[in-house]
């Protein structure tokens, strides 16, 4: 029994791979035409399909939308009962139907023509009514389905998904869509956290900023270290310009060397030190800390004025790893 299950599973995968391997050679003028129509679309790409084609169509619409092409899915039956009103003349419709003869098309195609809406077809029958009505046809035909009964859409749905990915990626690259663009449409994801967050989004503010004046003593700085627990204190002049930092390490070295706690902190601090810009990308700031092997740093504004503080734990808590 187990061997039979494995054999069927492997055979299914082999058949799907075999059919999918024929797709690249089919890409030609129609693929380029479809991509250009989408690229020059001033509205949205409306993806539609019935049954398994509809399920794949939802994924294709989602992929387009997340890679720079506004898109949504509409079910053909819903389209014929009011949702055609969602589609405007500046939109493009991508209709998926393996047979290319879905009965809904008899009613949808004339309405698209009335509105001068460009129709793209993804079908296994390029000479079907759908294929003949479309401005570009993407051929997803298969010699056989992977289903042992040759009935359930299997190889054909894989081909549909792959053709949709190929189209979306070609359009994405042509748009110059980059990582930051992707992050803007995925703000809650790990990539969004890495690329969209700025230092000022994560930094500690107000009373949570460890700081003392240049005139403060080592004792004052030690108490501030203890209060904030950040591992450093920013030492600032009267204009809030950071002149140096006093760290846990500086304190240990000062005490081991016999330094007095009443000494001005500017004699014990690390002059200058690393500061981070509030408007910098958080991922870049984290890399600065990692490269310099420090765990925290003061944050300054464009004028060099102290405005916050941040440590590595703040990055990790924001999902920037």
From Swiss-Prot:
Pfam families: CBS, SIS
Residues given in the record as substrate binding sites: 68-69, 75, 81, 107-116, 141-143, 215, 267
Alphabetized CDD domains for the sequence: CBS_pair_SIS_assoc (cd04604), SIS_Kpsf (cd05014)
Catalytically driven reaction(s): D-arabinose 5-phosphate = D-ribulose 5-phosphate
InterPro entries, per database record: CBS_dom (IPR000644), CBS_dom_sf (IPR046342), GutQ/KpsF_isomerases (IPR050986), KdsD/KpsF-type (IPR004800), SIS_dom (IPR001347), SIS_dom_sf (IPR046348), SIS_Kpsf (IPR035474)
Record site feature (Catalytically relevant), residues: 52, 104, 145, 186
Molecular-function annotations in GO: arabinose-5-phosphate isomerase activity; ATP binding; metal ion binding
Positions bound to ATP: 49-54
Keyword terms: ATP-binding, CBS domain, Isomerase, Lipopolysaccharide biosynthesis, Metal-binding, Nucleotide-binding, Repeat, Zinc
Domain CBS: 203-261, 269-321
Limits of the SIS domain: 34-177
UniProt xrefs under Gene3D superfamilies: CBS-domain, Glucose-6-phosphate isomerase like protein, domain 1
PROSITE patterns documented for this protein: CBS, SIS
EC number: 5.3.1.13
Residues that coordinate or bind Zn(2+): 75
GO biological process: keto-3-deoxy-D-manno-octulosonic acid biosynthetic process
Enzyme class label: isomerase
Similarity comment text for this entry: Belongs to the SIS family. GutQ/KpsF subfamily.
Subunit organization: Homotetramer.
Function: Catalyzes the reversible aldol-ketol isomerization between D-ribulose 5-phosphate (Ru5P) and D-arabinose 5-phosphate (A5P). It is also able of sustaining the biosynthetic pathway of 3-deoxy-D-manno-octulosonate (KDO), a unique 8-carbon sugar component of lipopolysaccharides (LPSs).
Name of the molecule in the record: Arabinose 5-phosphate isomerase GutQ
Organism: Shigella flexneri
């Amino acid at each position: 029994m187990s061997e039979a299950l494995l054999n069927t599973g492997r055979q299914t995968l082999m058949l799907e791979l075999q059919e999918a391997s024929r797709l690249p050679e089919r890409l030609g003028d129609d693929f380029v035409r479809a991509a250009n129509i989408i690229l020059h679309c001033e509205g949205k790409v409306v993806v539609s399909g019935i049954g398994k084609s509809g399920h794949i169509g939802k994924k294709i619409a989602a992929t387009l939308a997340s890679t720079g092409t506004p898109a949504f899915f509409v079910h053909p039956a819903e389209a014929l009962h009011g949702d055609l009103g969602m589609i405007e003349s500046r939109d493009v419709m991508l209709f998926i139907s393996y047979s290319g003869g879905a009965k809904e098309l008899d009613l949808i195609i004339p309405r698209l023509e009335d509105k001068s809406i460009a129709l793209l077809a993804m079908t296994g029958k390029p000479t079907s009514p759908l294929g003949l009505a479309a401005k570009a046809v993407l051929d997803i035909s298969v010699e056989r389905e992977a289903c042992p009964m040759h009935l359930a859409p299997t190889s054909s749905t894989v081909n549909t998904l792959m053709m949709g990915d190929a189209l979306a990626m070609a359009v994405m690259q042509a748009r110059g869509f980059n990582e930051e663009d992707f992050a803007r449409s995925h703000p809650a994801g790990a990539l969004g956290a890495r690329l969209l967050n700025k230092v000022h989004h994560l930094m500690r503010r107000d009373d949570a900023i460890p700081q003392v004046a240049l005139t403060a003593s080592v004792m004052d700085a030690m108490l501030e270290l203890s209060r904030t627990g950040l591992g450093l204190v920013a030492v600032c002049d009267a204009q809030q310009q950071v002149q140096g930092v006093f760290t846990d390490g500086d304190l240990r070295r000062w005490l081991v060397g016999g330094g007095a706690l009443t000494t001005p902190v500017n004699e014990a601090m690390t002059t200058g030190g690393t500061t981070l810009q509030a408007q910098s990308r958080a991922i870049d700031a984290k890399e600065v800390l990692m490269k310099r092997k420090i765990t925290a740093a003061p944050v300054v504004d464009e004028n060099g004025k102290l405005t916050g503080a941040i440590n590595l734990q703040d990055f990790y808590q924001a999902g920037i790893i």
